[in-house]
Amino acid sequence: MIIRSPESEVKIVVDRDPVKTSFEEWAKPGHFSRTIAKGPDTTTWIWNLHADAHDFDSHTSDLEEISRKVFSAHFGQLSIIFLWLSGMYFHGARFSNYEAWLSDPTHIGPSAQVVWPIVGQEILNGDVGGGFRGIQITSGFFQLWRASGITNELQLYCTAIGALVFAGLMLFAGWFHYHKAAPKLSWFQDVESMLNHHLAGLLGLGSLSWAGHQVHVSLPINQFLDAGVDPKEIPLPHEFILNRDLLAQLYPSFAEGATPLFTLNWSKYAEFLTFRGGLDPTTGGLWLTDIVHHHLAIAILFLIAGHMYRTNWGIGHSLKDILEAHKGPFTGQGHKGLYEILTTSWHAQLSLNLAMLGSLTIVVAHHMYSMPPYPYLATDYGTQLSLFTHHMWIGGFLIVGAAAHAAIFMVRDYDPTTRYNDLLDRVLRHRDAIISHLNWACIFLGFHSFGLYIHNDTMSALGRPQDMFSDTAIQLQPIFAQWIQNTHALAPSATAPGAIASTSLTWGGADLVAVGGKVALLPIPLGTADFLVHHIHAFTIHVTVLILLKGVLFARSSRLIPDKANLGFRFPCDGPGRGGTCQVSAWDHVFLGLFWMYNAISVVIFHFSWKMQSDVWGSISDQGVVTHITGGNFAQSSITINGWLRDFLWAQASQVIQSYGSSLSAYGLFFLGAHFVWAFSLMFLFSGRGYWQELIESIVWAHNKLKVAPATQPRALSIVQGRAVGVTHYLLGGIATTWAFFLARIIAVG
């Protein structure tokens, strides 16, 4: 830390009324672009309108104006999020069986949607228990509401209305900070103030308020619920907050108030700030008292972190200094110049944020099942499968987005004249070594991982099981993963003596938590089958990275097209007369990367779905005998490609294929329709623009003959547009197909 004389004070400066509010202007399609605002000559106009509406770089080159538009758009995004949340809470209040579920979560399924009986649609409302007929939901909201201490539908109504108010507030803020008081560029570039406020405010106070809410509202209410008290008999939240004696009956240390805090006698609070580990056997979720403790600790860390950066007080870290001091022995100028990049290129900034958030989202997917945070979440298999799948897909998309914006930064914002011998320049200078090595790794992983499966399929077909790679023949045990599992399983007695159980039951040991005769979680064994599929994961991830990284590193130039930067972010080919230069733009790398991301995530969610049904989920008898949904067939079946096709895809598709005539029939229709959407994408991906242009021209001829030709000239989609439409339908169709397949299966058997 460097202490200096105070620099120029940070002032919050805004421009008053910079842009007039004009509904006339907004009503004109394409008002942000001179060419688009002229109106359509050809049908390409509508595509350009959509492509450029949010590409603020194309509206103006003024960084301040771009920053204001992005800032304003963020408020619009928040408004939509609040609106969506409000809708979720409103459905919980108006159409759900939340109160019934709350009184008996093990026998009643969550439902918050009842289908209107139009032309026989009442079949879709299945019996979820307790005499309620509706669609079983798998969003996890009920479990979250219970963990928050919500006990009746009125509270859900109030929250829904509150979220609507906030949605309106956000819309107003977006308008106000663009049209009435727009911040100056210096405000957007003041990273130290931004870090302090985001760390201390959003993360610090956010975590602290959640911890406070849990201590004063959630914990007491959940204690009553766990003890079987009728939700209507439980005191209301404000009674716990206002009446300390009420809390002291549940947690005696409350009688002493804040005295233990200020006298450093913190162990008094160990009643509700615990460090137990494992799961609560009543609910199958993490101990809520552990969660409170965690959020309190996080809050303190971030409140401290939010006071670390130098603003007007001449004390603390300066980010520019930190970055410029960051030099290694082989990295030349190191991070010098990175500060300027990240404060003038929002694409570079966004790219980093997307990469981090994408990785974090995938981490969330893995923690939601291994450390289920909410009561009765672990035994709701449909919700568990949905949460994992959802967070995996979202994480994959965000990471591809990171590569997309990194490439846009390279094309639009990177200035090669000022960047010399810093880290980025050095990476670009040895990009050939990076990409060729990565390519070799992909080839190695691909041939070896699939080679192991092909070997097994061949031996299986020839009737030689003793020569297969399996737990019962030639073993390929994941010894490093097992070592990590074992280390964590032993932690409570060794490195974490204060904990009663390890962080997750999945690590190992003898613990099993079951709620209402259903397994919540148990130690997950890893064997040869997992070793094989993990190498498929490694392969697909490396190929995705290869495609995306090649797109970023070769975004400005390559041996094939040295002047690529002049062609822009997306272009079909390097003009006529240069064959073999198609699919080289940075955009095309994102396009191709999306398919491999889809491959990678598909294998992950298939692995998860089958592994959990085979080795974790199931029922437990009074004698303690566990019967898994697919009877532990993963270890022996998933070691051949035929096993994946026969015992996973085909065997588990029976529920969605046979869903007609049952309350799951909607999933059967979605399964069919999504397959169609997926197949429709191939029409765009496997045909050239010229084919369609020829077809269109003969159709236009027919229109002219009949004198019904439109004024706007029809045009075939451009090559890039066709690919965009193709990949969108491919992903949408594929994801919706998987969704229908998973849910019909798990709701039927789980």
UniProtKB/Swiss-Prot annotation:
Family matches, as Pfam families: PsaA_PsaB
Places the protein is found: Plastid, Chloroplast thylakoid membrane
Keyword set includes Amino-acid biosynthesis: no
List of residues binding [4Fe-4S] cluster: 573, 582
Record SUPFAM superfamilies: Photosystem I subunits PsaA/PsaB
Any one GO MF annotation of this record: magnesium ion binding
Membrane topology note: Multi-pass membrane protein
Binding-site positions, phylloquinone: 692
GO biological process, one term: photosynthesis
Cofactor: binding comment: P700 is a chlorophyll a/chlorophyll a' dimer, A0 is one or more chlorophyll a, A1 is one or both phylloquinones and FX is a shared 4Fe-4S iron-sulfur center.
Any single Gene Ontology cellular-component annotation: chloroplast thylakoid membrane
Transmembrane residue ranges: 70-93, 156-179, 195-219, 291-309, 346-369, 385-411, 433-455, 531-549, 589-610, 664-686, 724-744
Enzymatic reactions: reduced [plastocyanin] + hnu + oxidized [2Fe-2S]-[ferredoxin] = oxidized [plastocyanin] + reduced [2Fe-2S]-[ferredoxin]
Enzyme class: oxidoreductase
EC assignment: 1.97.1.12
Annotated chlorophyll a binding sites: 683, 691
UniProt keyword terms in alphabetical order: 4Fe-4S, Chlorophyll, Chloroplast, Chromophore, Electron transport, Iron, Iron-sulfur, Magnesium, Membrane, Metal-binding, Oxidoreductase, Photosynthesis, Photosystem I, Plastid, Thylakoid, Transmembrane, Transmembrane helix, Transport
Annotated family: Belongs to the PsaA/PsaB family.
Cross-referenced PANTHER family: OUTER MEMBRANE PROTEIN, OMPA-RELATED, PHOTOSYSTEM I P700 CHLOROPHYLL A APOPROTEIN A1-RELATED
Entries under HAMAP family matching the protein: PSI_PsaA
Oligomeric form and interacting partners: The PsaA/B heterodimer binds the P700 chlorophyll special pair and subsequent electron acceptors. PSI consists of a core antenna complex that captures photons, and an electron transfer chain that converts photonic excitation into a charge separation. The eukaryotic PSI reaction center is composed of at least 11 subunits.
Known function: PsaA and PsaB bind P700, the primary electron donor of photosystem I (PSI), as well as the electron acceptors A0, A1 and FX. PSI is a plastocyanin-ferredoxin oxidoreductase, converting photonic excitation into a charge separation, which transfers an electron from the donor P700 chlorophyll pair to the spectroscopically characterized acceptors A0, A1, FX, FA and FB in turn. Oxidized P700 is reduced on the lumenal side of the thylakoid membrane by plastocyanin.
Protein name: Photosystem I P700 chlorophyll a apoprotein A1
Source organism: Piper cenocladum (Ant piper)
Gene that specifies this protein: psaA
